[in-house]
Amino acid sequence: MTALTLHAETVAPRQGWRALLWIAPLTVLWTALNYWLPGIQGSGIPNAALRLIIQALISVALWQALEQCDLTPARRRNLWLGIMIPFTLWLAVIWGGAVNGVFRPGTVRLPLLPIAIFLPVIIGAPILLRSKRVGQVLDAMPTTWLVALQLYRVFGAIFLASWMRGAAPGIFALPAGIGDVITGLFAVPIAISLATGTLEARKAATAWNIFGLADFAVAVFMGMITSPGPFQLIVPSMPSIGAGAYPTVMIPAFAVPSSILLHVLSLRQLRRRSAA
């Protein structure tokens, strides 16, 4: 171990903790804005802006990673389109359905929201875990990218703001909001730590991914058993936030399954780096 490596291992954790000094206040500010001005989230503008920014970041990151792969320009372009077109169509279908109210309880007989949550994961996870091409892309991509991207999870603080206003039941809003905020707060510090390339950093990132997945498991379970529908077991004093309405329904219908797949990709990438 060189002096430079030791220096990097020492500096990275410090930078990670310093990142919390600006992420945490901004998260508190976002929560306060949604508490005092609930119309911000209800307008759909933050959701639309965030979704488009994430979509752009994923498309650029994928292209950058593909440029590092040993592929011809045509194969690189086709692979990029082969991933981004289905991903964009998925977003468009969910977005269009949400705007038109198809996820509202009683609109259709099928449990569309649970289907929207689980079906993409059931189909996508095996493909992402087994595809050799995806493995090549992950090998070419810095491990920091997939982790840092989930900084957007701090926007889950809207659940906490809704609970504080009395607009969402605590049995759902508290675990969902707290879990999302913790995952988002530590995304950048974990990513900074990963930049050192150490085994300890990869272990921390693996634990972070598992926590993020556990957060979704709890949030989805609590959301299903407290929301109107065939899976409801608990009837809270108020409906779960949004009750299938746009824009909030975009969180379980798209953000949750897409974030689960990002966790799956990150875990596969970390495993490949550890085995290398």
Predicted features by range, described:
Residues 167-181:
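Transmembrane alpha-helix entry/boundary detector in multi-pass membrane proteins
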Residues 20-27, 82-96, 112-128, 141-163, ...:
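Alpha-helical transmembrane segments of multi-pass integral membrane proteins
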Residues 6-25, 74-82:
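N-terminal membrane topogenic signal
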Residues 62-71, 94-102, 121-142, 158-161, ...:
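Internal transmembrane alpha-helix with an interfacial aromatic "cap," most often the third helix
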Residues 31-41, 68-70, 94-105, 159-168, ...:
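Juxtamembrane "helix-exit" motif on the non-cytosolic side of transmembrane helices
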